[in-house]
């Protein structure tokens, strides 16, 4: 019978409650261990055999069991006889020294046993007031054990006798570190014992295991998350993590590695996303890596989060995701879109979402095409990649990010003056909703479905309220009034200021600022011809009016000063007009040729007050004066204040002034020639690199909206997955409460040269009705189409059954409640029975599906427009 069996046989309730018995038994075990240690100490050449090793490990395990019995039995923290023996004899230190001298074949066995001993000390400590890890005779050997496992942050530690798989000792070591981190959460004071002298061994040792396979990697990630959550308020630990470790780099590098293992093609039709069985684990690893990255960003110190966001952008988005979208393989591009969409829908931490938005709006290809325009370009084609592109764009829309919507939708609408403020005011009227709602319901084909309008009224109201709440903190309302630097043109002067709730219309987004003289003529203080002083006398300027005007300036809309000379000839009144209708009236004097030439001289005498001074009018257009008589006549009407100077003094003043002006003009011309020569030399060296948008280079139309309208127009030719994703995109886009978008999407336009949604739907309806009349038993095709849609919906629900429940899960409408990303893994692909279709059968099937989808779309749009006056 082994000694362990003997120990178990002697176990009794009396033994369990007798500390003296513990001490006696401990002494016996220690004598055995001490003798084994002494043999190696006396004779360094002594070779330890297997039985000798097992005897030491077994007795050490029993000694630690007795130690934990003593520690847990004490009501208050105190050092008992057994713990004191560990301290005075330095038992753990001596055992580590002995084990390091073992042969390689025995060292791994001893290493694993020591890890289990420490795991027992950590996990079996049930006393809240006395954790043995605070004692140096216990803590220092633990640190030495960590050094034993120390290795590079990225590469595995692999000895000659080991392969690259995680060993059993490493698995137990990660479990030990995880339990230590759990103790840190239970007692935060322990953090000071493990983080000292700018060293955090427990955290550093976890980094190489972050992306290990199986439970080992999950335990390491959980442990790191626990550490960073406990130290979220500790700046010194945050600095250590970002500056002294490679944690942030490994985090994003591992994410990139998970992405590189994903399949280069996705099964299914683009709406149904399936992967081969061999890639299931890789997809699960990628999803877990995204969740871990997001969880770290939500719990860690702000400095750590900022560092992670930086590497997430540079190391993952721009170096991995972006190149995948620039390949020539459309299958791989479509798969990459699915993976990016999974990233967008998984990550919710604002800084990481901001990084994704930054890539969408600023990254360009070699031809200068912005990333989101690249995605939009893949919509054309109607294949699987087109379907995934529509779904990815829909995920952009669901972000409800003002910058994204400004780039994709609002910027082209605002800069191309899609509507006046008077036209947009119609959006607020309830009568518009009833009229337009009926117009969209009239677009339902004659062969349409039984009306489910009440369901759409309920679901759209919920989503419109949620979308309005998402947009509540946007900077601008995009209603043609508070549109910032893109104020829409007014139909009249009175209309220019209608619905203005603040005194000055200006923009914090504008690229041009007239401060501090933005509300005066030009960039200089106001000049009143009534205050002309005597010739040769300095003018006494009165800044009272200017100060009053400056006091009226709305500080919320003041822009930083800029150097107007940088704009050169680009800064013309016609371009400034896009900034603000009121600002335009004040800054038109910036260009002298435009302001002076545009208005002739006006000389008006007062007809209502004969006592008014002669200079009660404003003169302009002095460049039009070509004869001396007119010039004298104008001067005679001015009142000159002060005493008249002698003619000699006046002539001297004129000559002096003329000479100074002539000299200044010569110097100016010489300087301009010199600057021109320098610019010609410097110009080849200059290279302007810009990201994002120019303040002048705007597209004529929104590429996204244009693509959507083109897709609706070809509804009968498109495949079912494409039409479904397209209508889902329209459904999400139409819920935005901004008046300019609502007007563009829903209201009919007088301009017949441009396509509009309502007219397109009417055209598609007419086409479907005509085609339906020529198809025999079209009602049967409608029933088959409904069965196909139901079967497809069942497959998608089956794929998404294990995914987190969402608010859209029980929505019975067609364009809401879908899950674009299935959980990792592949489910059986069920298909309805099919046969060799003739060309006529394909046409009939597509027409029936188009009729069903159009019926749902019209009901959805009618429900939205009917409630816009209540939401907007």
Curated annotation (Swiss-Prot):
Ranges annotated as biased composition (Basic and acidic residues): 829-841
| Pfam families on file | DUF5917, RAI16-like
Which InterPro entries does the UniProt record give?
Answer: FHIP, FHIP_C
List where the protein spans the membrane: none
Chain intervals for the UniProt region annotation (Disordered): 800-841
Member of which family?
Answer: Belongs to the FHIP family.
Could you identify this protein by its name? FHIP family protein CBG19667
Gene source species = Caenorhabditis briggsae
């Amino acid at each position: 019978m082994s000694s362990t069996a003997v120990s178990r046989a002697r176990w009794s309730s009396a033994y369990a409650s007798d500390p003296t018995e513990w001490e006696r038994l401990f002494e016996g075990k220690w004598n055995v261990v001490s003798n084994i240690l002494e043999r190696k100490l006396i004779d360094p050449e002594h070779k330890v055999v297997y039985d000798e090793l097992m005897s030491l490990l077994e007795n050490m395990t029993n000694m630690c069991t007795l130690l934990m019995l003593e520690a847990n039995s004490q009501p208050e923290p105190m050092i008992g006889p057994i713990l004191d023996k560990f301290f005075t004899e330095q038992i753990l230190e001596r055992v580590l020294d002995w084990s390091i001298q073992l042969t390689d074949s025995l060292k791994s066995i001893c290493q694993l046993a020591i890890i289990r001993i420490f795991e027992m000390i950590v996990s079996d400590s049930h006393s809240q007031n006395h954790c043995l890890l605070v004692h140096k005779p216990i803590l220092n050997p633990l640190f030495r054990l960590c050094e034993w496992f120390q290795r590079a942050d990225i590469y595995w530690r692999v000895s000659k006798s080991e392969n690259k798989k995680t060993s059993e000792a490493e698995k137990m070591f990660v479990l030990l570190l995880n339990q230590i981190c759990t103790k840190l959460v239970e007692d935060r004071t322990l953090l000071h014992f493990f983080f000292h002298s700018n060293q955090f061994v427990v955290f550093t040792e976890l980094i190489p295991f972050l992306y290990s396979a199986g439970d080992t990697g999950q335990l390491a990630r959980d442990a790191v998350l626990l550490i960073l959550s406990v130290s979220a308020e500790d700046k010194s630990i945050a600095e250590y993590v970002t500056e002294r470790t490679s944690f942030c780099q490994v985090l994003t590098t591992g994410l990139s590695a998970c992405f590189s293992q994903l399949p280069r093609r996705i099964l299914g039709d683009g709406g149904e996303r399936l992967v081969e069985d061999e890639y299931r684990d890789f997809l699960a690893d990628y999803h877990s890596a995204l969740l871990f990255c997001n969880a770290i960003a939500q719990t860690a110190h702000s400095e750590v989060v900022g560092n992670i966001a930086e590497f997430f952008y540079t190391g993952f988005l721009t170096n991995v995701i972006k190149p995948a979208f620039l390949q020539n393989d459309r299958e791989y591009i479509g798969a990459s879109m699915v993976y990016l969409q999974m990233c967008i829908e998984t990550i919710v931490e604002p800084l990481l979402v901001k990084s994704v938005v930054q890539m969408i709006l600023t990254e360009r290809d070699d031809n200068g095409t912005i990333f989101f325009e690249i995605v939009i370009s893949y919509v054309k084609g109607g294949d699987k990649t087109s379907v995934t592109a529509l779904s990815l764009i829909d995920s952009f829309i669901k972000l409800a990010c003002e910058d994204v919507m400004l780039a994709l939708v609002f910027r082209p609408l605002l800069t191309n003056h899609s509507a006046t403020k008077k036209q947009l005011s119609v959006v607020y009227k309830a009568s518009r909703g009833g009229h337009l709602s009926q117009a969209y319901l009239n677009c339902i084909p004659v062969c349409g479905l039984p009306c489910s309008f009440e369901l759409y009224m309920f679901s759209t109201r919920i989503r419109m309220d949620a979308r309005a709440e998402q947009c509540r903190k946007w900077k601008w309302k995009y209603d043609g009034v508070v549109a910032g630097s893109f104020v829409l043109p007014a139909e009249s002067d009175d209309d220019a200021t209608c619905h203005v709730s603040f005194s000055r219309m200006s923009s914090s987004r504008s690229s041009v600022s007239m401060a501090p003289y933005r509300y005066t003529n030009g960039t200089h203080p106001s000049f009143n011809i009534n205050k002309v002083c005597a010739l040769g006398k300095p003018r006494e300027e009165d800044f009272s009016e200017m100060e009053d005007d400056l006091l009226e300036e709305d500080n919320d809309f003041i822009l930083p000063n800029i150097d107007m000379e940088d704009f050169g000839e680009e800064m013309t009144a016609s371009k400034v007009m896009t900034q603000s209708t009121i600002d335009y009236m004040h800054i038109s004097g910036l260009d002298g040729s435009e302001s002076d030439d545009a208005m002739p001289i006006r000389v008006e005498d007062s007809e209502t007050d004969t006592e008014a001074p002669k200079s009660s009018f404003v003169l302009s257009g002095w460049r039009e004066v070509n004869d001396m008589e007119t010039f004298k006549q104008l001067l005679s009407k001015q009142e000159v204040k002060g005493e008249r100077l002698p003619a000699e003094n006046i002539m001297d003043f004129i000559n002096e002034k003329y000479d100074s002006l002539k000299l200044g003009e010569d110097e100016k011309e010489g300087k301009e020639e010199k600057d021109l020569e320098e610019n010609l030399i410097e110009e080849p060296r200059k290279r302007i690199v810009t990201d994002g948008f120019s303040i002048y280079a705007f597209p004529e139309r929104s590429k996204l909206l244009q693509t959507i309208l083109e897709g609706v127009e070809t509804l009968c030719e498109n495949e079912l997955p494409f039409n479904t994703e397209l209508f889902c995109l329209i459904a999400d886009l139409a819920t935005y409460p901004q008046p300019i978008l609502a007007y563009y999407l829903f209201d009919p336009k007088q301009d017949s040269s441009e396509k509009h949604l309502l007219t397109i739907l009417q055209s598609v309806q007419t086409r479907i009705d005509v085609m339906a009349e020529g198809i025999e038993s079209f009602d049967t095709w409608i029933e088959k189409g409904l069965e196909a849609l139901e079967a497809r919906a069942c497959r998608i629900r089956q794929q998404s059954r294990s995914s987190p429940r969402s608010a859209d899960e029980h929505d019975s409408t067609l364009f809401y409640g879908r899950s674009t990303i299935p959980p990792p893994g592949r489910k059986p692909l069920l298909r309805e029975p099919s046969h060799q279709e003739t060309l006529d059968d394909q046409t009939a099937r597509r027409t029936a599906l188009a009729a069903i989808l159009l019926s749902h779309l019209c009901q959805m749009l009618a429900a939205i427009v009917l409630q816009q006056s209540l939401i907007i």
